[in-house]
Amino acid sequence: MSQHPTKFDVHHHFVPDFYVEALEANGGDPSGWTIPKWTLESSETLMENIGIGTTIFSMTAPGPSIHKDPSEAASLARKTNTFAAAVRDSNPQKFGFFAALPSLLNKESAISEIRYAIDELKADGVTLFTRYGPDNHYLGHPDFQEIWQELNDRSAVVFVHPTHGVDTNLVAPSLPQPMIDYPHETTRTAMDIILSGTVRKYKNCKIILSHAGGTLPYLALRVAAMMPHTPFGKSNGLSTDEIIEDAKSFYFDLALSGNEFTLGLLLKFAKPGHILFGSDFPYAPTKGIEYFTESFDKYEFSEEERAAINRGNAEALFPRFQVAQ
């Protein structure tokens, strides 16, 4: 494993002009968040300023699903992935990308894009949102099993990013959903794919949870300790230890989470090698990203732990980026 000193950012978004146009044509971001201005140069500036050597780009929610028409959503996904591949090809050791997909509710379209993006464009993984559709189709829903099978067959890296809940009413006008609700959406879908057996069935998938797993490390044992002893536990048959084992199987990025309180818990919870650096640029304010990065850089890790989280763990997950010794 390389000891390359620069950070490897697995949570970094791009916002091409054609996506901004799609958002604006469909009423804006349903989460209530402001659409940021983005250029490749702005990403490179952030990378230089906080010491990022490699970035995996992804399109955040709502992604291609902003189009309700399935053909328009499929077209936007294809355009996004073609754009991302061109950025990657401009500097393959500096950039990678997670493929954007149409809504998983349009199964054939989503599977087609998985095959094209991974098999033809050589995407580094795919982005899945925490839920799809007008109801609670979280990622453990039976309708998504064929999609998970496609990903499992390819040993895909699956980057799980939160999206807005069914209820888009805000807690307060000053608290848009990405600020406070998104981590809970991540926890919901993570527990759903555990209790539905999805994690155990599709073991080849390497699943990254955004934002240090939301509240999963804090709440996993609450579910695990009670579930086997309730009527609800009969449907999955998982023991307390099995639920925790599956919860620990995830990878966790540190986007907006590199602080002493979150790190203190996550280092105890996550498996060795499963914590990754993330920035959440450009949706997070640059000052916020700098704050969390500085907090992370000041945290009292061993040098080996710091090097692993900064880059080594990501290089193990994405071997094409490993730097020759």
UniProtKB/Swiss-Prot annotation:
Its EC number is 4.1.1.52. Keywords: Decarboxylase, Lyase, Metal-binding, Zinc. Pfam families: Amidohydro_2. InterPro entries: ACMSD, Amidohydro-rel, Metal_Hydrolase. It catalyses: 6-methylsalicylate + H(+) = 3-methylphenol + CO2. Disruption phenotype: Abolishes the production of arthrobotrisins A to D and arthrosporol A, and accumulates 6-methylsalicylic acid. Leads to altered growth rates and the development of much more fluffy aerial hypha. Shows significantly increased ammonia levels in fungal mycelia. Zn(2+) binds at H11, H13, H161, D280. Monomer. This is 6-methylsalicylic acid decarboxylase.
